[in-house]
Curated annotation (Swiss-Prot):
Lacks alpha-helical transmembrane segments, suggesting that it resides in the membrane via beta-sheet conformations similar to those predicted for other outer membrane proteins and porin. The SMP-LTD domain is a barrel-like domain that can bind various types of glycerophospholipids in its interior and mediate their transfer between two adjacent bilayers. Residues 358-370 have a biased composition (Basic residues). This is Mitochondrial distribution and morphology protein 34. It is a multi-pass membrane protein. Residues 1-195 form the SMP-LTD domain. Residues 371-381 have a biased composition (Basic and acidic residues). InterPro entries: Mdm34, SMP_LBD. Its main location: mitochondrion. Residues 330-347, 387-400, 460-480 have a biased composition (Polar residues). HAMAP family: Mdm34. One of its GO terms (biological process) is mitochondrion-endoplasmic reticulum membrane tethering. One of its GO terms (cellular component) is ERMES complex. It comes from Aspergillus clavatus (strain ATCC 1007 / CBS 513.65 / DSM 816 / NCTC 3887 / NRRL 1 / QM 1276 / 107). The gene is mdm34. It comes from the Eukaryota.
């Protein structure tokens, strides 16, 4: 299939070249330019030449009288040329400093002085080859799309052809810009030109937009507003001296006198005071409209800008670990009372702790452990703190079930009742807190007091038969009571002593337990009166403790004491 391609009308139309130059100039300045180019790129000359491009039809999709769509293979090697004009930065150090952050540059003075040189570039010997998709319509114009990069080579002639480095740099940069131009900008340029040629409505609208732009430019170039037309009432010069009307009349925008110093004396004083107050951190700041103050000028301003009545006063509240109640810091309450001196701060912090102390009395004490553990705990810091009244008889008195368990002998067996046959080498006695408080030098009679009470009350001694001891052990393990806990250390020691004497084999006890073994009969004779008094006191306090524990944990005691017989300690 053959067709005629007329290239001469495009060469003869002068308006086409003018419009094409404007579109090319806008396209070249649209993309980001390299930093070495410091001015706009202007297309000064455009010539398409006399040699048309060669087109080869590869495919025709649509063919009609007013429309056409096809794929062509285009190759061009003609005499078209393009001339550009711009300005470049000849000092490479200035370009380097402009493209780097200020804190990372050495900041030279004279070496970084800019030096701009006009540059004229001519593009010729353009060779193109590629596949083009062409769509033609009289209503929509011509659309040309390149499927690949059509630019093969071109020649760049510039003012710096004598410098090889600059010439190569310009060649590389211009080729990169032209590739972007052919792929992105050239199809849009061709489409707009075709609309201008074949669509009269588009041409009329474009002419109207051009006239509107010229009118706006003409209006913007007029003279500005004269600041001397309405001078202030009390004008002063740069030194602060007052000016009369004759001096003001002699001033003009073109005169050498500084017209910007024509300010009011009052405003100058206020500005000076404002500057001094900010420089010296003075509390005095003059009241100037539309000024944001960094500090309150007077109590009235603070009252006006204070918060509303509903704004609460913030105060710290502390939570107690292990309890459900929270209390308010006294320092916060005092500071809140001192801060609420202004009339606007009428909020009270009393309501912050209304619901905080609802369960404070019920949960103010430490949580009680209601499991009677006959084994020695791992740490000795869990020993309960006792009052001064029961500090003397804490080791032998029956503790409350609600209290934490007292530490007892360290046993290796899992059975909490049956003692080992032989004492271990690492045997430890229970920690007696009142020994550290009261500094009792003779703790041995306490063990004898428990033994005397066992004999007086008719309880089982260390020489009783094993059946009775087994019955007591089962009862203790079935129903743990505090009285049995208090008597267990004495029973263990007596059984160990009797077992050691029956076998006849001497067993050496640890040195830590020797002060608690009273084998000297003289001590018992001397302390017999003291033992009797202590036994009576212990029995009385045990009854009192039982009564107090019944009142504190009545439901717990009623659950056990109503069904079972009382322990031997409470038998008399």
């Amino acid at each position: 299939m053959a067709f005629n391609f007329n290239w001469s009308p495009l060469m003869a139309d002068a308006s086409f070249y003018t419009r094409a130059q404007d579109l090319l100039t806008a396209a070249l300045n649209k993309s980001p330019k390299p930093p070495i180019i410091v001015d706009d790129i202007i297309v000064t000359e455009l010539n398409l030449g006399s040699i048309p491009p060669e087109l080869e039809i590869l495919e025709i999709g649509d063919l009609a009288e007013d429309r056409f769509r096809g794929i062509f293979k285009m190759s061009y090697s003609g005499d078209a040329f393009l001339t550009l004009k711009t300005r470049v930065q000849a000092n490479p150090l200035n370009t380097y400093l402009l493209t780097r952050p200020s804190f990372a540059t050495p900041l030279p003075l004279a070496a970084a002085t800019p030096l701009t040189i006009p540059l004229q570039i001519t593009l010729s010997d353009i060779k193109l080859s590629g596949f083009v998709i062409l769509v033609f319509s009289k209503q929509k114009g011509i659309t040309v799309v390149f499927r690949n990069d059509p630019l093969e080579s071109l020649k760049v002639s510039s003012t710096f052809d004598s410098i090889p480095f600059v010439r190569d740099f310009l060649q590389k940069e211009i080729e990169a810009q032209l590739r972007i131009l052919f792929m992105d900008e050239l199809p849009a340029i061709i489409h707009r030109l075709s609309l201008r040629l074949w669509v009269p409505e588009y041409r009329a609208g474009e002419d109207f937009e051009t006239q509107a732009e010229k009118a706006e430019t003409a209006n913007g170039e007029g003279p500005g507003q004269d600041p001397l037309a309405s001078p202030p009432q009390d004008p002063v010069d740069a030194l602060g001296h007052a000016l009369d009307e004759s001096d003001i009349a002699s001033l003009s925008l073109d005169s050498s006198v500084e017209a910007h110093s024509l300010f009011s004396q009052k405003n100058l004083l206020r500005l000076a005071a404002l500057t001094d107050s900010q420089r010296t951190l003075s509390l005095f700041t003059p009241s100037i409209r539309e000024v944001v103050y960094r500090a309150w000028t007077s109590p009235t301003d603070q009252t006006d800008a204070a918060g509303s009545v509903t704004s609460p006063v913030l105060s710290r509240t502390h939570s107690q670990v292990g309890s459900m109640s929270s209390f308010q810091d006294s320092a916060s309450i005092a500071s809140m009372q001192t801060r609420s001196s202004t009339p606007s701060h009428t909020f009270s912090g009393y309501g912050l702790s209304l619901g905080a102390g609802r369960h404070s009395k019920a949960h103010s004490r430490k949580r009680k452990k209601r499991v009677v553990d006959l084994r020695r705990p791992k740490t000795t810091d869990d020993a309960p703190s006792v009052s001064d009244e029961s500090a003397f008889t804490e080791s032998t008195s029956a503790p409350s079930v609600c209290s934490a368990p007292l530490p007892i002998l360290n046993e290796q067996s899992d059975d909490p009742v049956t003692p080992p046959l032989s004492p271990d080498n690492d045997l430890h006695l229970p920690i007696i807190p009142d020994r550290h408080r009261m500094s009792i030098s003779r703790p041995a009679p306490r063990r004898d007091i428990a033994a005397e009470m066992m004999r007086d009350m008719g309880g089982p001694s260390s020489t009783s038969d094993p059946a009775t001891q087994a019955t007591q052990s089962e009862d203790t393990s079935a129903t743990p009571r505090a009285t049995m806990r208090a008597q267990i250390p004495s029973i263990y020691l007596n059984e160990k002593q009797d077992a050691g004497s029956s076998t006849g084999v001497p067993r050496q006890l640890p040195s830590a337990i020797l002060p608690f073994l009273n084998d000297n009969p003289m001590n018992r004779v001397v302390d017999q009166a003291l033992v009797e008094r202590l036994a009576g006191e212990i029995a009385r306090r045990m009854r009192d403790e039982k009564f107090m524990a019944t009142n504190a944990c009545g439901s717990f005691w009623d659950r056990h004491s109503q069904e079972e017989s009382p322990p031997p300690a409470y038998g008399h």
